[in-house]
Amino acid sequence: MPLTPETLPRHELVGLDCEVVAASNPDVIGISGTVVMETTQMLTLEGADRVWHVPKDSATFAFDLSTETVLVDGDRLVARPARRTENTGDSLWR
């Protein structure tokens, strides 16, 4: 499945450039970097000078694809990465 704005929430996020554009915690707004790790509840972004752990459920992320920037509500990403990206079986993400 190609990486498009419609399919982004079902893809592997590690390696994508990302920025926090909205969040319940104003301290994390504006954090940007490359996604280096993903867990069920967190995205880990590596910036120029440090590594940030941002909760998925309380933020909106802007992912930079090669052709455009895609906004994704973090609530859509809250799931085990393997479960969220699976292609077979009964899945809420399919």
Curated annotation (Swiss-Prot):
Keywords: Cytoplasm, Endonuclease, Hydrolase, Nuclease, tRNA processing
EC number(s) stated in the UniProt entry for this protein: 3.1.26.5
GO BP, sorted A to Z: tRNA 5'-leader removal
Catalyzed reactions per annotation: Endonucleolytic cleavage of RNA, removing 5'-extranucleotides from tRNA precursor
Top class in the EC scheme: hydrolase
Entry-linked Gene3D superfamilies: Ribonuclease P/MRP, subunit p29
UniProt-listed InterPro entries: RNase_P/MRP_Rpp29_sf, RNP1, Rof/RNase_P-like, Rpp29/RNP1
A Pfam family reported for this protein in Swiss-Prot or TrEMBL: RNase_P-MRP_p29
Location(s) in or outside the cell: Cytoplasm
GO CC, alphabetical: cytoplasm; ribonuclease P complex
GO MF term set: ribonuclease P activity; RNA binding
Superkingdom of source: Archaea
Region forming the signal peptide: none
Keyword Transferase: no
Role noted for this protein: Part of ribonuclease P, a protein complex that generates mature tRNA molecules by cleaving their 5'-ends.
Known partners and oligomeric status: Consists of a catalytic RNA component and at least 4-5 protein subunits.
UniProt record similarity statement: Belongs to the eukaryotic/archaeal RNase P protein component 1 family.
Descriptive protein name: Ribonuclease P protein component 1
